[in-house]
Design a protein with these regions (language model features):
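N-terminal beta1-alpha1 ligand-phosphate binding loop
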Residues: 2-28
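Active-site-adjacent alpha-helix of alpha/beta-hydrolase-fold enzymes
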Residues: 22-25, 130-137
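Cofactor-binding loop segments of dinucleotide-utilizing enzymes, especially the Rossmann-like FAD-
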Residues: 9-10, 37, 115-117
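Mobile beta-alpha loop/short-helix "lid" or hinge segments that flank ligand
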Residues: 35-43, 133-151
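N-terminal beta-loop-helix "entrance" segment that forms/cooperates
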Residues: 38-54
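Residues at the starts of beta-strands that form the adenosine-phosphate
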Residues: 3, 31, 109
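Helix-loop-strand module that forms the ligand-binding subsite of alpha/beta enzymes
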Residues: 54-134
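Conserved small/polar residues in nucleotide/adenosyl-binding loops
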Residues: 164-171
Length: 171
């Protein structure tokens, strides 16, 4: 089975959703490692700050964890119709690592999920565009939940199965 990295862009309901999905993924034989982007607390990315910061504390550790994942599941709330700032900022810093900004992302299988106050469709669309642009293979089915709509167990189970199917086609 796959080594999965669950990336959380919030500590609240999205972290709880990630734990719920983890239980299903582990029951299917996958291993799961969690990354909380808030724990890294990277400064806001700017070109000037990048030049002034030859070594960004924590970035190597984050790259190492993300590299271990054969696939990622990104959980993020919707902020003003798009991704939360911590996700955009982290991606900005990650894309500046090394000579090839897509190296970490290229051909990486990515699933998307959200627990949002609204519908969550906008953050899913924004993440789908961003991760696709970076070279990821984004799974078509997404997990959208909110206070009135609990996580769909069929979707929770279908997404880890998608990882398995995609890996089977790689060999």
């Amino acid at each position: 089975m796959a080594n999965l990295v669950f990336i959380c862009a919030s500590e609240g309901n999205n972290a709880l959703l990630a734990r719920e999905v983890e239980a299903h993924a582990v029951a299917m034989g996958h291993s799961v490692e969690h990354v909380s982007l808030n724990e890294y607390d990277f400064p806001i990315y700017t070109v000037a700050r990048e030049k002034a910061t030859p070594v960004l504390e924590g970035i190597d550790r984050l790259v190492e964890v993300l590299d271990r994942g054969e696939a990622w599941f990104v959980f993020a709330p919707e902020y003003n119709g798009t991704c939360p700032p911590v996700l955009n900022n982290t991606i900005a810093w990650l894309s500046r690592e090394g000579d090839d900004f897509r190296r970490l992302f290229r051909d990486r299988v990515v699933a998307l999920g959200t627990h949002s106050g609204g519908g969550g469709n906008h953050v899913i669309m924004a993440m789908r565009m961003q991760f696709s642009f970076l070279g990821c293979v984004v799974i078509g089915r997404s997990l959208l939940t909110n206070k009135k709509k609990p996580a769909n167990p069929d979707t929770i189970n279908a997404i880890p199965v998608s990882y398995t199917h995609l890996r089977a086609h790689e060999t």
